[in-house]
Amino acid sequence: MTRKLVLLRHGQSQWNSMNRFTGWVDIGLTEQGHQEATMAGHLMKKEGLEFDVAHTSLLKRAIHTLQDALKALDQDWLPIYKSWRLNERHYGALQGLDKIDTAAKHGEEQVNIWRRSYDIQPPPIDLDDPSHPMRDRRYAALDRKVLPVRESLKNTLERVLPYWNDAIAPQLNDNKTVLISAHGNSLRALYKYLNKESDEKILNVNIPTGIPLLFELSDTLQVVSYRYLGDPDAAQRAAEMVANQGKAK
């Protein structure tokens, strides 16, 4: 009997629509983002998915996406677990910058490396920056040493993996059907781990907003199959749009 896991990237955020690096900045959804989240719920309902538990980050774009999707699923009552470990990758000093302007300044190749490589970090955020996570009370209980000033995808995976091992994997092993509403890079990290994707191939993996990615896992949590729900061509086009965000005009 296979276990079912759905990875759902949040719907379009306000900074997605403005093509800005977002990272740990707590930006809300656009109206389109809410619609994407609701449509994701309808797609999961059409698939006949009945979840036992849901997980999300501490950032409202992922939280609100989960709320909208569960409402469309008529599964609002599900227990929801929130963890900072599911937050987006911290983009350091790039946070808030326009991706096209940054590509024009530093070159498309450099921006693509910052965005999509596995182990290269962006420039760090300054410790005195008002947006440093140590100034955000949602992280007040955490040791400052674990709060990032920048992250590569490798760093993000190292952050996400303990939560997977301690919270999510045990639920899957208990035959629970699990929904994770999170972010492009925290989900890319899980995608890499689940699919045993190479450091090179992960460069070309782009996860679109608001389209559920359904994994079927064996009893040892090995991937049996995975696919986007809905129109596969639409999912491919949406992923290509994500890939093109870092290109200069």
Curated annotation (Swiss-Prot):
Key words of the record: Gluconeogenesis, Glycolysis, Isomerase
Keyword Ligase: no
EC numbers on record: 5.4.2.11
Catalytic residues of the enzyme: 10, 88
Matching InterPro entries: His_Pase_superF_clade-1, His_PPase_superfam, PG/BPGM_mutase_AS, Phosphogly_mut1
Sites where the protein binds substrate: 9-16, 22-23, 61, 88-91, 99, 115-116, 184-185
Site location (Transition state stabilizer): 183
Domain of life: Bacteria
Catalytic reactions of this protein: (2R)-2-phosphoglycerate = (2R)-3-phosphoglycerate
A GO MF label: phosphoglycerate mutase activity
The protein's annotated pathway: Carbohydrate degradation; glycolysis; pyruvate from D-glyceraldehyde 3-phosphate: step 3/5
CDD domains per UniProt: HP_PGM_like
A Gene Ontology BP annotation from the UniProt entry: glycolytic process
Cited function: Catalyzes the interconversion of 2-phosphoglycerate and 3-phosphoglycerate.
Family classification: Belongs to the phosphoglycerate mutase family. BPG-dependent PGAM subfamily.
HAMAP family the record matches: PGAM_GpmA
Complex formation: Homodimer.
Protein name: 2,3-bisphosphoglycerate-dependent phosphoglycerate mutase
